[in-house]
Amino acid sequence: MGKVIGIDLGTTNSCVAVMDGKAPKVIENAEGMRTTPSIVAFSDDGERLVGQPAKRQAVTNPERTFFAVKRLVGRRYDDPMVEKDKKLVPYKIVKASNGDAWVEADAKTYSPSQVSAFILQKMKETAEAHLGAKVDQAVITVPAYFNDAQRQATKDAGKIAGLEVLRIINEPTAAALAYGLDKAKAGVIAVYDLGGGTFDVSILEIGDGVFEVKSTNGDTFLGGEDFDMRLVSYLADEFQKEQGINLRNDKLALQRLKEAAEKAKIELSSTTQTEINLPFITADQSGPKHLTMKLTRAKFEALVDDLVQKTIEPCRKALKDAGLTAGEIGEVVLVGGMTRMPKVQEVVKQLFGKEPHKGVNPDEVVAIGAAIQAGVLQGDVKDVLLLDVTPLSLGIETLGGVFTRIIERNTTIPTKKSQVFSTAEDNQNAVTIRVFQGEREMAADNKILGQFDLMGIPPSPRGMPQIEVTFDIDANGIVNVSARDKATGKEQQIRIQASGGLSEADINKMVKDAEINAAEDKKRREAVDAKNHADALVHTTEKALAEHGAKVEEGERRAIEDALGDLREALKGDDAEAIKAKSNTLAQASMKLGEAMYKQQAEADAAKDAAKDDVVDAEFTEVDDDKPKKSA
């Protein structure tokens, strides 16, 4: 078995590491750098450039230079965040045949997985040159908040690059592995990971070689690229005020602004003022124009303050989900290049009440952790156990459009859970299983991952068939769902495929809006529950009335029929209180019917007892009260 490498496939930069004996080692690329820009370009003659060579020619070739493509992985073309990106990047983002966002150069389109694969190939070649041997297996990191489709797309990228991806590992978890491998001290740590394109926070408990993730949260569209773009917008606005020329219409100028913004951002982490100087940025009838501007750290911090503040809420939610307070966190580990920014460090210190740990290299720590996990899988690293979690709840749509969770968020993976559901109609011979991911009460408000049909259910009254739905999440966080009719043994399963990722509006909407809209969600959920209860009451009352209606007086029967009519009418609307009231009226009216049924049964039993000489003790068996839930 050859060496298994660890790769941090980043939005802005990527890094590769390998276990060198007992210690992980970051490998330098052909340019002598320990990190490689996650940039792919195509030259005039069609040559593909990756990394530093691609970055060097970006200013003169902006339309064929792809950067930050990781942010498009698993995203739909009509995603609001893609719309935003389209206005800011100089290259062309196009709509693929499946509705995903792809990129285009020289009339040829590339999926984000393909572009990621070009970067992975570069990392693979870097490792092979260092090791002097072929490499075909890797552990690749992804943001903790990546969904199933995005993880699958990352595995696909590895495959395209000629790598068997042994494990997909979350970036904050990898960082924790690197931080805690040689530390004997047990405790709880928080990993604050603000990278080039994504933000993650994970709370972990470390002790005796066990790294257990307690909770995770994040934002898949928040990172250094947003800070750069905020500064680009400011520079473009200021230039337009002074010169009356909109640089956003000039792709060459836009690329120069992007490079200048990134450079200024980095410089302002170690100095309080920098100068941006871009001669001949554009020209008009009066001649060439130059952009010269002094930028202070205070001004830059004011421009991006809301972006820094956006990291606070996910941290609070992660603490809440872990059942911990900020004071119970022993150490805060900073990961990602953006954590070098003094303002970010200040916010982290205020939030957790302690100085963050700066003993790890934020650009390399994730790749080092991936290499350690590779060593664990290869057997080179002993006594290390990694227990990660799934970031969002998974479940199916049930009667009335309700989202029924089968696996809750922050459940340790790998995991497998089943739940029994039933049919909603008499003689229903098929059910559609619609799989969702999110935190809202109604399925439609969450992200649909896929759907499939279970056919051939034997004709029977509703509520009778038992359909067992099983969710299986592997250690990579990739989902398999199966449904089985317990009576016939017929089974259907689906591996959720990457048909488009969770957008910013989708992912964050799931968790953030869940709290904002909690009251509305509760109201809608109550309405559905009331309807389901009322529907069942109508069904059982109609059946009882047909079988035993003759045993009650005419006036009582008419009262039941009137109450039935009123409830049916109420069911046409969505007023939960009205449905509950009409349900109670019907339940009261039906009591006489129930009494008549019990009376008849009691008389029959008495007749049987009279015919017997001996009294025989009854045998009791325990009955499971859990009735199957109804599925659409």
UniProtKB/Swiss-Prot annotation:
Species whose genome carries this gene: Rhodopseudomonas palustris (strain BisB18)
Annotated TM spans: none
Family: Belongs to the heat shock protein 70 family.
Domain of life: Bacteria
Entry-annotated residues carrying Phosphothreonine: T198
InterPro entries in the cross-refs: ATPase_NBD (IPR043129), Chaperone_DnaK (IPR012725), Heat_shock_70_CS (IPR018181), HSP70_C_sf (IPR029048), HSP70_peptide-bd_sf (IPR029047), Hsp_70_fam (IPR013126)
Residues of the signal peptide: none
An example Gene Ontology molecular-function term: ATP-dependent protein folding chaperone
Keywords, sorted A to Z: ATP-binding, Chaperone, Nucleotide-binding, Phosphoprotein, Stress response
General function of this protein: Acts as a chaperone.
Matches recorded under NCBIfam families: PRK00290.1, PRK05183.1, prok_dnaK
Keyword set includes Ribonucleoprotein: no
Keyword Nucleotide-binding annotated: yes
Induction text: By stress conditions e.g. heat shock.
Gene3D superfamilies hit by this protein: 1.20.1270.10, 3.30.420.40, Actin, Chain A, domain 4, Substrate Binding Domain Of DNAk, Chain A, domain 1
Annotated protein name in UniProt: Chaperone protein DnaK
